[in-house]
Amino acid sequence: MGKIALQLKATLENVTNLRPVGEDFRWYLKMKCGNCGEISEKWQYIRLMDSVALKGGRGSASMVQKCKLCARENSIEILSSTIKSYNAEDNEKFKTIVEFECRGLEPVDFQPQAGFAAEGVESGTVFSDINLQEKDWTDYDEKTQESVGIFEVTHQFVKC
C-alpha cells in the first residue's frame, strides 16, 4: 500500500507553528482494510510512542490489528521524520503534517483532538494543549493584546 500523507488546511489568525506535541500525541483515524475494504466504525488512535512487533520478526509498527471481516493482519506506522508544523505561510493551503507507512491499513478519516500547540506570530507566546475537535480554536495573546485563532480545519489523505 505504501506511504500515505495526512494534509491539513486551516485559517490561522495571529498564530504559527501549529504542531502535534510529544510522542504520546494521539492521531485519531478511521481505517480501511486494504484486503476486503472494511472500514472501522470507531475512531482508533495511534501514537509515536507505541511499537508493536509484526509477526515473523518483520519489524514493528505503531498499530497492528486483525481485520474483523477477513481476519488479515494489517499494520500502520507513523513516520516520525515526516511530522511537520503548519505555519502562517501555509495559511488556507493543504500541507503535509505527517506520513504513515501503510501495510494493509489505509486511513480514510482523521479527527483532530487535543495535544496541538502553536505560537503567536508577533509575540512568540506559546499556546499549548490546543483542541481542534470542533475544527476551530480561539484564545487571546496578552503580549500583543490580539485575539488568536485557528479556523476551518480540514484535511485530506494523499498517496506519496
Curated annotation (Swiss-Prot):
One of its GO terms (molecular function) is zinc ion binding. The modification Phosphoserine is found at residue 75. SUPFAM superfamilies: MAL13P1.257-like. Keywords: Metal-binding, Phosphoprotein, Zinc. Zn(2+) binds at residues 33, 36, 67, 70. It holds the Pfam family CXXC_Zn-b_euk. InterPro entries: CXXC_Zn-binding_euk. Monomer. Belongs to the UPF0587 family. The N-terminal and the C-terminal half of the protein have a very similar 3D-structure, suggesting they arose from duplication. Requires a bound zinc ion for normal folding and solubility. This is CXXC motif containing zinc binding protein.
